[in-house]
Design a protein with these regions (language model features):
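A short acidic/glycine-rich loop-to-helix N-cap element
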Residues: 254-265
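Short, gly/Ser/Thr-rich active-site loops of penicillin-recognizing serine hydrolases
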Residues: 165-168, 267-296
Length: 296
């Protein structure tokens, strides 16, 4: 089974850059705008929402909401957007529909029609619950942020060769513009701080600037009809080099044993993959770029 295109997961906190990007692009919030995060407990309808590790955040900027991964802060950002605008951005980012990658069995994920949203939906989706995404959807969406706001149709190859000659070429294909270039740059800067100062420090790669987001999603247990307190999907999604991305990678670990936080489990794997991939692609490190500029 090709989980990258056939399996859907609740993404958890790796979905938070989507609400941040939407709010910034819609002009309803800026990275330095502050939101009160209710000291760790917030009532939404009949439900109570808390923070991971029982954090008790007070006032946080939008940037720090993403850097520190505040669930309540994400809800506050989503409320600034409103249901209709947030739903439209989620669709523009490619969720709830197939990416068109062309691989057999691709799933479209799960995104309820706006008319089916209940009072909790806006809040839940803001921090990556009540929505199902495929890994290729999530990677395509984060790539749109890295690409200056343009969503591309993913491809698995650039060309087909026969006897050393190009038989068929697959040109890059733009799906649509999702957010502006300026908005994308602001979100990229936020995601760089996640790795520099926040939950994603273990994703850092020496010599390169990395941008990304951690996620620790509780798995839904259909037997109890509630979220498990012992089973998680731990993840890290990001790209590098941050300001001129060559690779975007999602690491998802289904039901890790022991430590389960994405920043501890998935981020180090991401770091190792990115380091070796950039080396394989001969992408110069920051030190090499400085040397080249000095020589010039």
């Amino acid at each position: 089974r090709n989980h990258a295109v056939m399996s859907s997961y609740e993404p958890g906190s790796i979905f938070k850059p989507i609400v941040a990007a939407a709010a910034i692009d819609a002009g309803v919030a800026r990275p330095n705008d502050t939101f009160f995060c209710e000291n760790g407990k917030f009532k939404v309808g009949n439900a109570k929402v808390g923070e991971a590790v029982n954090h008790k955040f007070g006032w946080l900027t939008l940037q720090d909401i993403i850097v520190k991964s505040s669930n309540i802060g994400s809800i506050k950002i989503a409320r600034q957007l409103g249901k209709r605008s947030y739903y439209d951005y989620i669709r523009k980012f490619g969720f709830g529909q197939k990416t068109g990658i062309g691989l057999p069995g691709e799933a479209g994920g799960q995104l309820k029609e706006l008319s089916a949203w209940d009072p909790m939906s806006l809040a839940s989706i803001s921090f990556g619950q009540e929505i199902g995404v495929t890994p290729i959807q999530m990677t395509s969406a984060i790539s749109a942020i890295a690409n200056g706001g343009t969503l591309m149709v993913p491809r698995i190859t650039r060309a087909i060769l026969k006897d050393g000659q190009i038989e068929k070429r697959f040109e890059p294909k733009i799906a649509r513009r999702v957010i502006s270039i300026q908005s994308s740059r602001q979100v990229v800067d936020i995601l760089k701080h996640v790795v520099k100062d926040g939950t994603g420090k273990n994703a850092a790669v020496k010599g390169y600037e990395v941008a990304g987001k951690t996620g620790t999603a509780q798995k839904y247990d259909p037997k109890t009809r509630s979220y498990s307190k012992t089973a998680y999907v731990s993840s890290f999604i990001g790209f590098a080099p941050a300001d001129a991305a060559k690779v975007a990678i999602l690491v998802m670990i289904d039901t890790p044993q022991g430590v389960h936080y994405g920043g501890s489990v998935a981020a180090p794997v991401f770091s190792n993959i990115v380091r070796e991939t950039l080396r394989y692609l001969n992408v110069p490190s920051n030190d090499q770029l400085v040397y080249i500029l000095d020589r010039a």
